[in-house]
């Protein structure tokens, strides 16, 4: 991409052309448009011609505008080729008289976006050369010779096409042939305009025509040439530097002032426009007693920074008074007041400055050279705002080269720098501005979290469990986690704590993440049984008697589903029991429950599908009797009498003697026949 790159090269992007086209279409309306009729031009009668006065009158009445605005709009329409003149084709303006005009065919409108190629223009020039027998305009001859050299390899094709078009044109009648010639000429006057005419289709950097410049066909006078020579001589006298030196100065300036840039480096103690803290304005007041350290350090950058700051000027004035040259800064301030003060008081202020600083024997007389004094005194005869610029510049350079360097080394500046305060950064409020907003770490993407969750589930499912090993399916795990909603530990005052529960009422489970100590996840009941099997065996060996059996998971589920305590039901045959178990699993486990809760022997389920909080529920709930129902896995194995544990993920746990009998170890799946 270059500096002259326009993008979408040479395509008319002017939106107003569409508005002009809509207006031209209204003009051609046979009922409400411009009045058109056959007009005789030379020896030919041209159809659908109109006069310039009729066009202007229609524009004024249609758009309700003045005659001057209508004339300007009409010139636009003609210059862009929507209307072309019949009598003076080169003069692309709309004359408010009886001059004849005609509408251009839509094929030649600028918005058709087909390029005006050199081949088409060469064919047009060759056809005119044949028709006029070599009599062309000067610029047309130059273009003809240039295109002949440029397209010499296919010039025979150009000549052949020109002859064919000329032969086809002779077969038309005289009126159509004349109208077509005028249309082509008007098109090429717009797209290949003669020298000295403005190309209306140029835009951007291509539009270099200045309407005020001297025309090409006019000769320059001696005065104009002398002015041009003087301009170039002054341009040669200007000092120039290399681009590398200029860029180096810009980089140095940026590095020097970067710490004082409130946008790039921030401001101390805080930005008052963001934090609503006005301490920054209080510390940086114009004549504050103790300025900030950053403000005092900035005075050492250059003399303009010092003299621009009111506090810096006050300190510098104190230094100049000690050196008996305070009148220099006073004169500079008086000149600034004259330059930017009221216009009505310019003469009065100029006289006061002259009497105080410039007159012989003045009270605060300044020391300037005689030449500058003569220029100043001569200008005071007719005072204006800038009459003292010469004297002001002289005093400014004197202070910059002499007094400024000594001020930076003086104890006044060093004491000011030592006493300057350095405010600490205060806590900012949340900001909506991007350059002052504190950058926060973005949270992980939900897609990544979902992938991690799926990977964890896949790893858990990949852990094979051998459920045929004896003595590994008993005893609840001491580390249990039951997920029932959002993650929040129960409060001590929760109505679900052990101290607040009533053993006679069902439990409503809150949506909480209830954890026991040292727990991480909520394992499946089979996995809990596998991990706790070794502890159960040791417990069975060392204890002679066991605690009374607590309710099983399915018994607790039956108790929570029924509104009253269930009564004992007779056992069903094995196959009927299998079908009943599978139907209840689909009805209760899949349809009624929002999630598949993994329950432990001490987590009774309730009818609303949530999980009861962990605790001493098993000891408080009464012994329940339920039907013997099979689940996906029915685990039958030897259970010690009065062990206080029950089978997990099963509804086989019965009551009475059937639950106390030792049975043979077997695994029954729902896809196998009992």
From Swiss-Prot:
Show where the RGS domain sits.
Answer: 298-413
MF annotations from Gene Ontology: GTPase activator activity; GTPase activity
Q: Which residues form the DEP domain?
A: 30-105
GO CC aspect terms? cytoplasm; glutamatergic synapse; neuron projection; plasma membrane; postsynaptic density membrane; presynaptic membrane
- Could you tell me which Gene3D superfamilies the record lists for this protein? 1.10.1240.60, Regulator of G-protein Signalling 4, domain 2 (1.10.167.10), Transducin (heterotrimeric G protein), gamma chain (4.10.260.10), Winged helix-like DNA-binding domain superfamily/Winged helix DNA-binding domain (1.10.10.10)
Q: Which PROSITE patterns match?
A: DEP (PS50186), RGS (PS50132)
Q: Which InterPro entries match?
A: DEP_dom, G-protein_gamma-like_dom, GGL_sf, RGS, RGS6/7/9/11, RGS6/7/9/11_DHEX_sf, RGS9_RGS, RGS_DHEX
Q: Which residues form the G protein gamma domain?
A: 219-280
Q: Where is the composition biased (Polar residues)?
A: 553-565
Q: Name one Pfam family in it.
A: G-gamma
Write down the PANTHER family for this protein, in alphabetical order.
LP21163P, REGULATOR OF G-PROTEIN SIGNALING 9
Q: How does it assemble?
A: Heterodimer with GNB5. Interacts with RGS7BP, leading to regulate the subcellular location of the heterodimer formed with GNB5. Component of the RGS9-1-Gbeta5 complex composed of RGS9 (RGS9-1), Gbeta5 (GNB5) and RGS9BP. Interacts with PDE6G and GNAT1.
Which pathological condition is tied to this protein?
Prolonged electroretinal response suppression 1: A form of bradyopsia, an ocular disorder characterized by prolonged electroretinal response suppression leading to difficulties adjusting to changes in luminance, normal to subnormal acuity and photophobia. PERRS1 is an autosomal recessive form with onset in childhood.
Its protein name is Regulator of G-protein signaling 9
